[in-house]
Amino acid sequence: MLNTLIVGASGYAGAELVTYVNRHPHMNITALTVSAQSNDAGKLISDLHPQLKGIVELPLQPMSDISEFSPGVDVVFLATAHEVSHDLAPQFLEAGCVVFDLSGAFRVNDATFYEKYYGFTHQYPELLEQAAYGLAEWCGNKLKEANLIAVPGCYPTAAQLALKPLIDADLLDLNQWPVINATSGVSGAGRKAAISNSFCEVSLQPYGVFTHRHQPEIATHLGADVIFTPHLGNFPRGILETITCRLKSGVTQAQVAQALQQAYAHKPLVRLYDKGVPALKNVVGLPFCDIGFAVQGEHLIIVATEDNLLKGAAAQAVQCANIRFGYAETQSLI
């Protein structure tokens, strides 16, 4: 049984982690923590997230020193802000824990990336080198040996799952950059109150145009440039990405389908559509990424959907943990 600590459990992704870990037959929750300054400290997780009433009634404990919580802990999930994960991950690693970080603090092995896109100076370049990128369907072998797993961002997960098989099969004309138009539910912005996310203010609109930090994350791990435009959707959760690409001359619809099938035939959390394209409603609340596509001449439109809090965060983190410790990949997820 793996003793498991969830840090930042009060947020949306944190609560989903609690749900998955609680029903995992090989994991035991040792504590749920929040920052020492959090207004949620001392409250029950089920008071903040009533779906957990009668299931998990643990308190959210304030954490100011990891030594209060790290003894005897095997696994730590960090559902914390980027700067917080940056500071906490090295301490938990030093304490002998395997760390799964849901923030962006260790996703790209380039310290200058963090100054430019995250606004802080990265102090641990050696950990950037050691961290395994947790795109579970593609990085499984690295995950099996890693002690620090950087869980990909929500947008990058869907984008890479859609594009990587086609790039690896050399089917795309990358002189024309793939264009990713992505829309996410408001939960992607977290639980903290903000006027722009309030019911009467939220509106479908693009943001971070040409400046969003997920663009370089996607491009770095794909090994190909992309144009990425995220949009805020006026719905609670889920991500839908419509990706426009140019195929190399002579590439057929059958070749596209074959590349996707070969990549995901034995990957249970990626569901491929033989006909049509996926809808958001079919993945919300589920740990899958659904992918469908259409071809017209040399033009390809590929659509990927996922729940931003699940396959885009908590479910992928647990999927990575399952791979790391040799459990069934879908254990506790489906």
Swiss-Prot record:
Keywords, ordered alphabetically: Amino-acid biosynthesis, Arginine biosynthesis, Cytoplasm, NADP, Oxidoreductase
Subcellular location: Cytoplasm
The reaction(s) this protein catalyses: N-acetyl-L-glutamate 5-semialdehyde + phosphate + NADP(+) = N-acetyl-L-glutamyl 5-phosphate + NADPH + H(+)
GO biological process: L-arginine biosynthetic process
GO MF terms held by the record: N-acetyl-gamma-glutamyl-phosphate reductase activity; NAD binding; NADP+ binding
Enzyme class, first EC level, given as a word: oxidoreductase
Catalytic residue positions: C154
Entry's EC annotation: 1.2.1.38
One Gene Ontology CC term in the entry: cytoplasm
Entry similarity comment: Belongs to the NAGSA dehydrogenase family. Type 1 subfamily.
NCBIfam families noted in UniProt: argC
Protein name as it appears in the record: N-acetyl-gamma-glutamyl-phosphate reductase
Gene that encodes the chain: argC
